[in-house]
């Protein structure tokens, strides 16, 4: 009976995956269907949202029918995560909006102060951070350099996946219109960033981890919507201050919670900006 239930569960997961693929194909519907790279919201929590639910990691067709239950349990234990991931999403500090190229869009003096305050705040939380990953855009790199002064022993790496962009056409529609190709190009990359960085811990990870991603407002807002299984097109309804901290927790069972969203309360009021 246990094996039968597992097979049914595995079939449901497979059906869900096939459903996501089918949803991305055009059926003569609206442009939003074609441009969306995220699974449609159902109103129910998808336990296998990161495709790392232990049952989905097991090739059920290889399970021996006679020793099925015991063999299946061994496989499930092998793929079962043990650690919790703590992910801090930091929005870059204020930068010069009038720069002609990304190289020219450096932090303002206020932006450098904001990054300094964010670095102090992260250090004061007392966590043993495992890694910092930052966007390759100038404003994110400069924010990282300043924050790193307060976390000198934390390894850093960069990722183009975290660069700013337009993830999906927002709802409700806004006045600053963008052509479809912008979402068509940026959307899959930002979705790829979500899938690459936001998931439950690897089964081999023994201890809880504390990771920092330093990137951009659109990326963070989209990631929050996807991680909490909110409609992804709602991303623009969220507003984030420069240098703010958003804190996600991913449990071994795949449950996700948010402990901070755009927190900038550690900054004096006169140092807060949103550009």
From Swiss-Prot:
The UniProt entry lists the main location of this chain as: mitochondrion
What is the topology of this protein in the membrane according to its UniProt annotation?
Single-pass membrane protein
EC number assigned by the record: 3.1.3.16
Q: State which residue ranges cross the membrane.
A: 7-24
Q: Which is an annotated Pfam family here?
A: His_Phos_1
The molecular function terms of the Gene Ontology recorded here are: protein serine/threonine phosphatase activity
Query: What does the PTM comment state?
Result: Phosphorylated by the RIPK1/RIPK3 complex under necrotic conditions. This phosphorylation increases PGAM5 phosphatase activity.
> Looking at the UniProt record for this protein, which Gene Ontology cellular component terms does it annotate, in alphabetical order?
mitochondrial outer membrane; mitochondrion
For this protein, the record's InterPro entries field holds: His_Pase_superF_clade-1 (IPR013078), His_PPase_superfam (IPR029033), Mito_Ser/Thr_phosphatase (IPR051021)
Q: Which keywords does UniProt give here?
A: Hydrolase, Membrane, Mitochondrion, Mitochondrion outer membrane, Necrosis, Transmembrane, Transmembrane helix
SUPFAM superfamilies for this protein: Phosphoglycerate mutase-like
Does the keyword field hold Transmembrane? yes
Instruction: Give yes or no: UniProt keyword Transmembrane helix.
Output: yes
**One biological-process term from Gene Ontology?**
programmed cell death
Q: Which branch of life, at top level?
A: Eukaryota
* Record field: catalytic activity: O-phospho-L-seryl-[protein] + H2O = L-seryl-[protein] + phosphate; O-phospho-L-threonyl-[protein] + H2O = L-threonyl-[protein] + phosphate
Q: Where in the cell is it found?
A: Mitochondrion outer membrane
What does the entry note on its domains? Answer: The N-terminal 35 amino acids, including the potential transmembrane alpha-helix, function as a non-cleaved mitochondrial targeting sequence that targets the protein to the cytosolic side of the outer mitochondrial membrane.
As for family, the record states:
Belongs to the phosphoglycerate mutase family. BPG-dependent PGAM subfamily.
Role: Displays phosphatase activity for serine/threonine residues. Has apparently no phosphoglycerate mutase activity. May be regulator of mitochondrial dynamics. May be a central mediator for programmed necrosis.
Task: Output this protein's name.
Answer: Serine/threonine-protein phosphatase PGAM5, mitochondrial
Q: Which organism is it from?
A: Xenopus laevis
**Lineage of origin:** Eukaryota, Metazoa, Chordata, Craniata, Vertebrata
Task: Point out the gene that encodes the protein.
Answer: pgam5
